[in-house]
Amino acid sequence: MNIQEQNDFRQSLEEGIVSLMEQMSPLSYHDYHFDDYLKKEVFVAFEDVMSEDEFNTFYDEVIEQIFLQHKLIKRSYVLSDQRFDGNRDYETQIQYLKDVPQPAQKTPEWYTFRKAHLTGSNIWKLFSTPGARNQLIYEKLAPPSSNVFRNNLSEGPLNWGHKYEPLSILFYEYYNDVIVEEFGCIPHKEIPFLAASPDGIVTSQKNNGRMVEIKNVVSREITKIPKMEYYIQMQLQMEVCELPDCDFVETKFLEYENESDFYKDKYNTTKGMIVVLVKDNSSYIYEYAPLFQNQESKLNAFMESVYEKYNLCSPTLEHDGIRWFRNVYWKLDIYSCVYVPRNELWFNHAQPIMKETWDLICQEQEIIDSHMKYKPKSNKSKTPKEPNTPPIQVIHL
């Protein structure tokens, strides 16, 4: 296309996108395939004048500019600074979040608090399948499990996330030159049944107030597109914390077979060591060597400092129920950061669904054993399913 044809195409593309976005149901945003469906719907108007490959090339070049120009809400941005105003100051809001009473994590009070709220980690089930919704209702109605307060020493995906989330935060801080602080489970200021637990919020002057959501991938592909449940989780977190921006960070760490392989990999700088300890034979303690300090002498000195911290005369001894377990040698294989803006339009349309479900839960709590009719029929995979219907749903006025 010559310059005039490109300008005409862009103008037509803008008109098509703006028109389609105005007609679209806001609840379409949480669908994983939102951007793909939007592109396909827009292409229908151009399929008689150009090939799909030509259309895709130009569309991908200008789509983010069009959204920014028309102040449309995009599901996510690969470039995390596209819509962030670094001059805004959220110090007052951050202090408010710090001052909100929050039970300590993993305590009985923490579990009780979470059971009394819809939280970011499970609220996606309301927007998935009927079975997933029933599972959420069952979780809120069922009596607490006798094992709910116990930790374990499994090496499953949950513990993998606990092990590598602090490292992901360290890399995020390093790459963005910021400071991230942890927060507990925060209740919504006005909606009493909603709460959220952000992985972190930037508290340094640079990027002040930006939220961070971490996912440590074990095996799935990192596509730079937040899955449905993650998108909903971030929207609830931004709503609860009243902050407009969230960076969605996905990392994939690999572990060396042994110490020897770690030191042989001389040219990889994004690697390091974790000293793993066990407390009371029930939970892990992770101590992270500083980033980029991988000389053998420095790692040995770090191990000695860990033994001294826990009063361990040697790694084979135990003190106050704490003992050395092993050293993990890791390397960062993939780091991905995607910017997700707060979508108040989506939340305003999603809130009635949340309230309807919570009202039902409150009604069922008055009935003995009401949880049994919501009990999942099998223990098959609980992986959330994306809706089968396309997300571009037109609102008929």
Q: What is the predicted role of each segment?
A:
Residues 1-397:
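Accessory terminal regions of nucleic-acid processing enzymes
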